UniProtKB/Swiss-Prot annotation:
Enzyme Commission code: 2.7.1.40
Pathway(s) of this molecule: Carbohydrate degradation; glycolysis; pyruvate from D-glyceraldehyde 3-phosphate: step 5/5
Subunit structure: Homotetramer.
Swiss-Prot/TrEMBL induction comment: By tartrate.
Coiled-coil blocks: none
Name the UniProt record assigns to this protein: Pyruvate kinase
Organism of origin: Agrobacterium vitis (Rhizobium vitis)
Amino acid sequence: MFIRSNRRAKIVATVGPASSSPAILRSLFLAGVDTFRLNFSHGSRDDHAAAYRHIRALEKELGTSIGILQDLQGPKIRIGVLHEGRLQLTKDAEIRFVCGTEPGRGLMDIPLPHREIFAAVKPGDDLLIDDGRVRVRALGVSDEFIDAKVIVAGPISNRKGVNLPGTVLDISPLTPKDRKDLEFGLELGVDWIALSFVQTARDMIEARSLVSDRAGLIAKIEKPSALDEIDDIVALSDAIMVARGDLGVEIPPEDVPGRQKELIRACRIAAKPVIVATQMLDSMVTSPTPTRAEASDVAGAIYDGADAVMLSAESATGAFPVETVEIMSRIIEKTEKHKFYRPILEATEPQIAHTPPHAVATAAADVALALKAPVIVAFTVSGTTASRISRARPPLPILALTPSEQTARQLGLMWGVVSLLSPTVDTYEQSVDRATQAAVQTGLAEKSDQIVVVTGFPFATAGSTNNLRVTQAG
């Protein structure tokens, strides 16, 4: 049995060429990874299937539950092939986007094989090329072309990405490739599906119709239009990822920190986990130590109340994947122990509508704190009871006992929660007995310690959080 209780916030790490071997995956997990991410923008299905098998073997070896997150590529918009493969755009130059894959007749004609863009763009709209390095503004639009003026100059080359801030495209959030990858991931048994480039709440409805309850659904927030519908998107999702890379291209960079705080708050109100992602320790792709700004960025996300922070290239292709996880874990631990951490967390606690389940969860945190209990034990089928207690951010571990293997794995994203597979209980007394035993078996409490036990009645009913008891461990 492996139990990690040295910190509350979680770590997500991306698997790639630098980290796909069984030995490195084991080292990453022991260094602090709680959930592994399979990025389907890169690598083959065989690569991802092999990583999946290695993680599940590690899970069995250590007697623990490890979450696996499948990140779908999404509908990436790209220009086509240029006349000479490369084009230098100068400020105020006029260019023409041509609908199709082939270059137009003129040297300044840029193929754009996405007819939905020509239907959506209006004069005055901006188009960003190559992650925002080049910016052009639409002057005139037809079904076959967009005439534009260069606002920010720079070079472009074949198949560079295009972003359209503020423009909602009439496209599915799932490409044909995504749909095949999705079915592949669900057949493997991934625990989370992350949906890229979510534009509206409708995108989540479409994805849910395919995923159902076979995995948790994560909305990646990287479009301004998603920010406009964030409450509905959170309601339709099981978790949120603050994907700051593309989001920082489509909105001004100075707006990203505030938006990050807003998204974390929205998820905390809804009692759903939120992951802060992108370039958190990016310099560690090539360096054994992070910059001080990167350390502050990780700490800032923890002070904001994020459930998890994520590594991308750092663990997938970097030279120091294990060291990166170790440093990230130490930053989280140090931040959570700082004298300002609790006051900041409590000062930013959102006001939640008073319902019996919320009242019981909040009371559990308050009672545990007053009694100096070492752990709160929660019985949960769907994970909802544990998530409600997690929302209260108690300064002690939450031991979630669940009969569901999927729930145990998914709780690897939830702040402060340690999950343990446990048989379904039939009576209230059985639940208390099991809680007291598990608290000691996991090392989270000692015999005779007072612990707080939270259950729901009727038993094995998802979402019923209505009972609290103080008892002795042992």
